[in-house]
Swiss-Prot record:
It comes from Mus musculus. The RING finger is required for ubiquitin ligase activity. InterPro entries: B30.2/SPRY, B30.2/SPRY_sf, Butyrophylin_SPRY, ConA-like_dom_sf, PRY, PRY/SPRY_TRIM62, SPRY_dom, TRIM/RBCC. This is E3 ubiquitin-protein ligase TRIM62. GO terms for biological process: innate immune response; negative regulation of epithelial to mesenchymal transition; negative regulation of viral transcription; positive regulation of antifungal innate immune response; positive regulation of canonical NF-kappaB signal transduction; protein K27-linked ubiquitination; regulation of viral entry into host cell; viral release from host cell.
Length: 475
C-alpha cells in the first residue's frame, strides 16, 4: 500500500524521504547528509555506528544506492495525496496487483510501478474513487450541455422547417400576386389597344366615307364640266358666221349646270392622334387604374415642432434656424423631436407615397402610431410606436429597430418610397428611383398610423439645410 511504501522510503534520522540515499555495511539506508552529520557528532568518541543497529565501523564506506534512489524518484513524481487516497478496492494491476491511480490530465489509469512517473510529472493525479466522482460530474455537465444543445438544435430545425414551409407558401402566393399584377396590366393594355384600334377604324371609316362621297360628287361635276367644254369647243369650231351666231342664243341654256366651282374642303386624317408620345398617352390613360397610386399626402401643421417651417400646401418641411415660431402648444405637437405627422391616418388598405430626400445628411421618415407620445425625447423604435428608417452621420442609413439595423445602400438616396399594407402588417421602404428594396417591417399594427417626417436639424455651415418634400405625382 501507499502508506507502507512511504514508510519504507523515510530516513530514520530526518524522518523525510531519502535524499541521495547511501547504504552501510549493515545494509541500512540513510540520507548521505544525515549519516555524515551523525558521524561528525561521534568523532569525539572515536567510533562510528549505525543509528539503526548500533554496529560500529572503524572506517565506514558509504555506498550509493542507485536502486533506492530510482524508487524515491518514481514515488516523488506522484502527488502524495493521490497515493494516500488510493483504495485497495480499485481494479488491480495484472502484473503487480497494486493500487491503481488515475491521471486526470491524460484521462488514463496508472500503476505506480508499470507507468513511468516522469511522464505524468506536474499532472493532476488522483485515486480511483476521486477520479470516478470527478469524471462523473464532468460527464454529467457535458451530457447536460449536449442535451441543451440538442434541444436548441431541435427548436432551430423546427423553426427552419416552418420557415421553409412559409417561404414555399409565400413564394407560391407571391407568384400569384405577381402574375395577377402583370395580367391586370396586360389586360388593361389589351383593352386600351382594342379601344384605340376601334377608334382608329372608326376614324378611318368616317374619313374614307367622306372622301368617297366627294369623289363621287366631283366625278359627276367633272363629267358635266367636260360636256360643257365639248359644247363650247364645237361652237368655236363653227367657221360660218351666220351659223355660229344663230346658235349662240341656245348656248347658255345648254351650258346651264355644266359649270361648277371646285371649293374642295376636307379634314386631314387625325394621324397625330395615334402618333406623338403614344406610350406616355397610354400610360396616362392607365394611371387611373394603377393601384396603389402615389398618395397625395400633406403634413399636419398642428403636430409640427415649433422649429419646423411648412410650405403653404403642407407638402414641404424644413428646419428653421431662426427663433422658434410662436405656436400654441398642444398634446398633438412635438415639443422636443423636430418632427411632424401626416394629416391622414391609416387604419386599413394599401398605400404608397414618396419623399424627396436629395442633398440631405440627416432625416427620419416612416410611420407613427396616432397615439404615440409626442412630448419629450422620444426613442424612434417599434416598441414606442414608430416604424422608420433614418439617414445619419452624413452617409449612413439604418432601420430604427432595437438595436438599429444598418441598411445596405450602394448610392446616396434621392427619393424614398414608402409602401404600407395595413391589413397584412407590412411596411416596406424602397429606393424610389429604381424601386430597389431597402427594409421591411412586419408588425401587427394596433391602431391608426400616420406618416412621420423629421428633416433633422440644419447647421450654420450649410449642411442639411434642404427640406423634406412629399413627391406628388401629377398626371
Amino acid at each position: 500500500m501507499a502508506c507502507s511504501l512511504k514508510d519504507e522510503l523515510l530516513c530514520s534520522i530526518c524522518l523525510s524521504i531519502y535524499q541521495d540515499p547511501v547504504s552501510l555495511g549493515c545494509e541500512h539506508y540513510f540520507c548521505r547528509r544525515c549519516i555524515t552529520e551523525h558521524w561528525v557528532r561521534q568523532e569525539a568518541q572515536g567510533a562510528r555506528d549505525c543509528p539503526e543497529c548500533r554496529r560500529t565501523f572503524a572506517e565506514p564506506a558509504l555506498a550509493p544506492s542507485l536502486k533506492l534512489a530510482n524508487i524515491v524518484e518514481r514515488y516523488s513524481a506522484f502527488p502524495l495525496d493521490a497515493i494516500l487516497n488510493a483504495r485497495r478496492a480499485a481494479r488491480p494491476c495484472q502484473a503487480h496487483d497494486k493500487v491503481k491511480l488515475f491521471c486526470l490530465t491524460d484521462r488514463a489509469l496508472l500503476c505506480f510501478f508499470c507507468d513511468e512517473p516522469a511522464l505524468h510529472e506536474q499532472h493532476q493525479v488522483t485515486g480511483i474513487d476521486d477520479a470516478f466522482e470527478e469524471l462523473q460530474r464532468e460527464l454529467k455537465e457535458q451530457l447536460q450541455a449536449l442535451q441543451d444543445s440538442e434541444r436548441e438544435h431541435t427548436e432551430a430545425l423546427q423553426l427552419l422547417k416552418r420557415q421553409l414551409a412559409e417561404t414555399k407558401s409565400s413564394t407560391k402566393s407571391l407568384r400569384t400576386t405577381i402574375g395577377e399584377a402583370f395580367e391586370r396590366l396586360h389586360r388593361l393594355l389589351r383593352e386600351r389597344q382594342k379601344a384605340m384600334l376601334e377608334e382608329l377604324e372608326a376614324d378611318t371609316a368616317r374619313t374614307l366615307t367622306d372622301i368617297e362621297q366627294k369623289v363621287q360628287r366631283y366625278s359627276q361635276q367633272l363629267r358635266k364640266v367636260q360636256e360643257g367644254a365639248q359644247i363650247l369647243q364645237e361652237r368655236l369650231a363653227e367657221t360660218d358666221r351666220h351659223t355660229f351666231l344663230a346658235g349662240v342664243a341656245s348656248l347658255s341654256e345648254r351650258l346651264k349646270g355644266k359649270i361648277h366651282e371646285t371649293n374642295l374642303t376636307y379634314e386631314d386624317f387625325p394621324t397625330s392622334k395615334y402618333t406623338g408620345p403614344l406610350q406616355y398617352t397610354i400610360w396616362k390613360s392607365l394611371f387611373q387604374d394603377i393601384h396603389p397610386v402615389p398618395a397625395a399626402l400633406t403634413m399636419d401643421p398642428g403636430t409640427a415642432h415649433q422649429r419646423l417651417i411648412l410650405s403653404d400646401d403642407c407638402t414641404i418641411v424644413a428646419y428653421g434656424n431662426l427663433h422658434p415660431q410662436p405656436l400654441q402648444d398642444s398634446p398633438k405637437r412635438f415639443d422636443v423631436e423636430v418632427s411632424v405627422l401626416g394629416s391622414e391616418a391609416f387604419s386599413s388598405g394599401v398605400h404608397y407615397w414618396e419623399v424627396v430626400v436629395a442633398e440631405k445628411t440627416q432625416w427620419v421618415i416612416g410611420l407613427a402610431h396616432e397615439a404615440a407620445s409626442r412630448k419629450g425625447s422620444i426613442q424612434i423604435q417599434p416598441s414606442r410606436g414608430f416604424y422608420c428608417i433614418v439617414m445619419h452621420d452624413g452617409n449612413q442609413y439604418s432601420a430604427c429597430t432595437e438595436p438599429w439595423t444598418r441598411l445596405n445602400v450602394r448610392d446616396k438616396l434621392d427619393k424614398v418610397g414608402v409602401f404600407l399594407d395595413y391589413d397584412q402588417g407590412l411596411l416596406i421602404f424602397y429606393n424610389a428611383d429604381d424601386m430597389s428594396w431597402l427594409y421591411t417591417f412586419r408588425e401587427k399594427f394596433p391602431g391608426k398610423l400616420c406618416s412621420y417626417f423629421s428633416p433633422g436639424q440644419s447647421h450654420a455651415n450649410g449642411k442639411n439645410v434642404q427640406p423634406l418634400r412629399i413627391n406628388t405625382v401629377r398626371i
